[in-house]
Amino acid sequence: MGQSSVAQFASELGLPAELLLEQLRGAGVNKTAYDDVLTEQDKTSLLEYLRKEHGVQEPKNKITLTRKQVTEIKKSDSSGKARTIQVEVRKKRVLVRRDPALEPVVAEESAEIAPAAVIDEPTLQAAPVVLPEPEPVVEAVPEPVAVEQELESEPEPTVAPAEPEAGEVAVAVDEKPTADARPKLTARELLGAEELALREREAKRQAALMAIQAEELRKKQELAQRRQEEAKRAAEAAANKLSEGTLHKPVAKEAPKPEEKNAKKTGKSGGKDWNDSDGKKRGGVKGRSDAGVAGQGWRAKGSKSKSKNNENQQHAFTAPTEPIVHDVLVPETITVGDLAHKMAVKASEVIKTLMKMGMMVTINQVLDQETAIIIVEEMGHNAKAAASNDPEAFLDEAEHAEAVQEPRPPVVTVMGHVDHGKTSLLDYIRRSRVASGEAGGITQHIGAYHVETPRGMVTFLDTPGHEAFTAMRARGAKATDVVILVVAADDGVMPQTIEAVHHAKAANVPIVVAVNKIDKPEANPERVKQELVSHEVVPEDWGGDTMFVEVSAKTGAGIDNLLEAVLLQAEVLELKAPKNIPAKGLVIEGRLDKGRGPVSTILVQSGTLQRGDMILAGTAYGRVRAMLDESGRDVKEAGPSIPVEILGLSDVPSAGEEVIVLNDERKAREIALFRQGKFRDVKLAKQQAAKLESMFEQMGEGEVKVLHLIIKSDVQGSYEALSTSLQKLSTDEVKVNIIHTGVGAISESDVNLAAASKAVLIGFNVRADAGARKLIESTGVDVRYYNIIYEAVDEVKAALGGMLSPEQKENVIGTVEIREVFRISKVGSVAGCYVQDGVVRRNSKVRLIRDNVVIHTGELDSLKRFKDDVKEVKSNFECGLSLKNYNEIEVGDILEVFEVVEVARTL
């Protein structure tokens, strides 16, 4: 039907005629009366207008149903603890109603519009709704009711690919044929050729997509079937392997096919157990007939059900035939449980291996990297040392390669043997009196000074010469450009002189030798040169490359020549450093000041350190609150090669740590805390290893006496040197155990720790505060104060010697000749003797010698002279004596009388 009136078209659509006229006017079709004729052009214009008005992208007659299901699963983490994880599954389903405008429309006005029929054309199946109406009058079909019936009863709907993204489920609706047989509008008449072509292409795309999905589903099913067959064959092989060597006759009947299993589910024998099918509740006692059947339940009987159970309950997992070798990345510290997890073995296996290697460990014990690598290789895996995920790796990013390099003053370290005049030499250069202020006249700290000379600025580092300060001297050589080796002309080359040469050569630093004390009459500079040549330090006038300068720190002779030699050596090195960048440097020394907190001596090596900078030094960080030079004057900035004291760090840094300026306080705190944790883990692992080693040593050697010490000093380098020297005093019988070392005054916590651990408190250049002194009086803790390292080492050495068990020594006190032997019943043999020399005492120990051979060693039982018991008989007197429990005495025997005395031992 090509044309119809407005009233007829309104009745066909089920709309009021007035509403249709309004929509036509909105579409630009000028119709005013109900009898006006509508052409195909007018209907197309109306359709396009309605599409533009309501849009076709989001059809109104579409319902999206979402379903959310939350379940919980239990999963174990790397440490073996079970954790509950919530899993949320969301499903989305889209129900679409077909638009009545796309189907043949019934022209009867009074009849209700029935639900749309199942559409067979593929173009209409994939089509979206064309005419959604905003008014409730337009939709005569009760859509929500139809959807609820669809969800509740769920008849078999016809699936049509309406929207591939959402769920591709459409509502199937039935067609009710009406009695009126009026002409109908077809979809081809309502839709243009372009729209139909578009829908055909969409239908073809949907068909191709469904074909691809069907092919993928088929492949997945084939793969699953293939895996099931492989698992079945593996299960049969395992069952055959288990049945080998049994006494019963093997089951000859083949396993039933999968089709037969479903058919025999309800038989008497019952393919599956009605209760406890997997045998978890009861293991059951296997008889001889059950030996070849794996995985059966406890109700299974007979060979028929055995083979059936074997198929149904055989797990698909097959054990690997070869050992799996893992590549294990081992960090610096790792617990036993984590190491087992990385190797995919039980923690008990790792503990067993460690016990075989002589280590008693627990699952949470921390192992160091070296031990963990040995364990991994012992268990047949490949161990690799893991690169640490250190946040300080980002510190190298801020390299300032474009910074201008400027000349800087040389850093000169003065090294040499103790009492050879290092500090006195510096005193003359600085025109100060430092050596007289040092305890005992020896240097026990690194002193850093910068000196203005007529030839330029020089920074001096004065190091201790005592043997205990090896680590300090090594730090001084590391931070320096030139080493002045001070050798006394009257003393020559000594052990610490040789050690200083080794430190300088290890750091690849040039040496200038200062032969000191040439003003003494016994000075012999040539001997110094000869002794140093044997240690590869050859003077220039002997064809070498080392400058020798003869000086006197007392008279000042040769000091100018020494400075000239040092500056000449520095010019050869062409020392340069950038100045206008964030500073980097080295911690020379650190101490805890009671009023100012942690104080650190820092040598700036590059850049400029300013007040207010955020710095990181090892495990300490903080903002520079104040900077002081070596004279105690306040400075605002310090350039390269300038030593300064800084205040404001969170803790006392370790000497030798690198100092770096950071812009971000948060990053500085993060790196410092990371270093603290790493240091603590490594220290704990080493302590544990040391405890185990000492435990096995004690088991082998018996009880070892231990002297517990707590050391507090004024600076970090002092307690480092003191603890190293004291630990060297340990022997196999007595050991020094340093429980705690620290910087600062002795506090109450130190006293409490000493009281709990029965330790001796040593204060080196520090004293106890008021609260600690009261606690010391009440607890009776032994506290010793020292200013010189010699005295501390000597007293601890004496204390260790007192702890040694005394040595027993035999002391011969007399010799007795037996001249007559009397045999007395009830008494035994009594000897008449003559004391040749010495003295004989009652209850002394004697040694019986016959023909110069010791026959018996024992004690005197009685000693008499003229029938009287006496305590002792001196030489040239006669006496009678008897031996305890020994009667084989002959005339002519010699008795050697001796006493056992205890002699105190020393280290």
Swiss-Prot record:
Highest taxon above the source species: Bacteria
Subcellular location: Cytoplasm
Region of interest called G3, as start-end residue ranges on this chain: 462-465
Family recorded in the similarity comment: Belongs to the TRAFAC class translation factor GTPase superfamily. Classic translation factor GTPase family. IF-2 subfamily.
Binding site for GTP: 416-423, 462-466, 516-519
GO terms under cellular component: cytosol
Region listing for G4, in residue ranges: 516-519
Biased composition (Basic and acidic residues): 223-235, 251-263, 270-281
Role noted for this protein: One of the essential components for the initiation of protein synthesis. Protects formylmethionyl-tRNA from spontaneous hydrolysis and promotes its binding to the 30S ribosomal subunits. Also involved in the hydrolysis of GTP during the formation of the 70S ribosomal complex.
Renumbered residue ranges of the record's region G2: 441-445
The keyword rRNA processing is annotated on this UniProt entry: no
Taxonomic placement: Bacteria, Pseudomonadati, Pseudomonadota, Betaproteobacteria, Nitrosomonadales
Pfam families in the record: EF-G_D2, GTP_EFTU, GTP_EFTU_D2, IF-2, IF2_assoc, IF2_N
Annotated disulfide bonds: none
GO molecular function, one term: GTPase activity
Region G5: start-end pairs: 552-554
Region (G1): 416-423
Keywords: Cytoplasm, GTP-binding, Initiation factor, Nucleotide-binding, Protein biosynthesis
Protein name as it appears in the record: Translation initiation factor IF-2
